[in-house]
């Protein structure tokens, strides 16, 4: 049955099915992003616990060295004849203690840096995910029209990558497809691979314009036109 002969109910059911498929695709993408964030946090917690265990061991070693130092000093007091040898041992223990204290400071600095890096990454992923979801909700009606009438397919190809595939672009070959990847894992959107390949200056222009206006429909129209010109 052609679109013109469909009843309003049939058209509604068809549109509803497309909307459900579209929502499922992006629910999957967002779920993968959340899973990546959770995995990063878990890895961070494991690393922090390992470093804390190392710190505890170093503190225990330091206390042990302090006890040894006390014993050495007592021996020096009791045996003056062995003063020089015992003093060398004390000096060596002091150097080891300083070295362990330095290692402790370095480990604490590493813990702080790791915490900061994980927090920055988490914030960036959450911000990107929220921005992407909000923009998709805003552009959803127009994206449905593209998917229904212009042969658009949107594929999730990674935890931070989407692939836009266009068909119905060549009247001589209706099955011919062109596509473009979009990286959405950072604060700014990045254009990935495409077919046919886009020139580097065109990719830079696309990224700058899209990150400025943040309108998916406008971006898709531009990409489709550029790829069609390369056929």
From Swiss-Prot:
One of its GO terms (cellular component) is Ndc80 complex. The keyword Cell cycle applies. Keywords: Cell cycle, Cell division, Centromere, Chromosome, Coiled coil, Kinetochore, Mitosis, Nucleus. InterPro entries: Spc25, Spc25_C. It holds the Pfam family Spindle_Spc25. Component of the NDC80 complex, which consists of NDC80, NUF2, SPC24 and SPC25. This is Probable kinetochore protein SPC25. It comes from Debaryomyces hansenii (strain ATCC 36239 / CBS 767 / BCRC 21394 / JCM 1990 / NBRC 0083 / IGC 2968). The gene is SPC25.
């Amino acid at each position: 049955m052609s679109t013109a002969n469909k009843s309003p109910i049939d058209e509604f059911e068809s549109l509803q099915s497309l909307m459900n498929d579209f929502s499922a695709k992006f629910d999957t993408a967002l779920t993968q992003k959340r899973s990546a964030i959770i995995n990063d946090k878990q890895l961070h917690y494991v690393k922090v616990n390992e470093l804390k265990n190392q710190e505890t061991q170093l503190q225990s070693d330091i206390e042990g060295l302090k006890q040894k130092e006390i014993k050495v000093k007592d021996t020096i007091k009791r045996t003056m004849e062995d003063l020089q040898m015992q003093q060398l041992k004390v000096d060596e223990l002091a150097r080891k203690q300083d070295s362990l204290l330095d290692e402790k400071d370095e480990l604490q600095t590493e813990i702080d840096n790791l915490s900061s890096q994980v927090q920055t990454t988490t914030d960036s992923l959450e911000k990107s995910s929220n921005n992407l979801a909000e923009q998709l909700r805003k552009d959803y009606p127009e994206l449905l029209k593209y998917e229904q009438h212009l042969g658009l397919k949107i594929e999730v190809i990674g935890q931070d990558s989407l692939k836009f595939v266009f068909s119905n672009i060549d009247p001589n070959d209706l099955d011919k497809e062109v596509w473009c990847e979009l990286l959405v894992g950072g604060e700014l959107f990045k254009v990935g691979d495409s077919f046919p390949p886009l020139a580097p200056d065109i990719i830079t222009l696309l990224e700058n314009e899209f990150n400025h206006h943040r309108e998916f429909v406008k971006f898709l129209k531009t990409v489709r036109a550029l790829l069609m010109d390369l056929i």
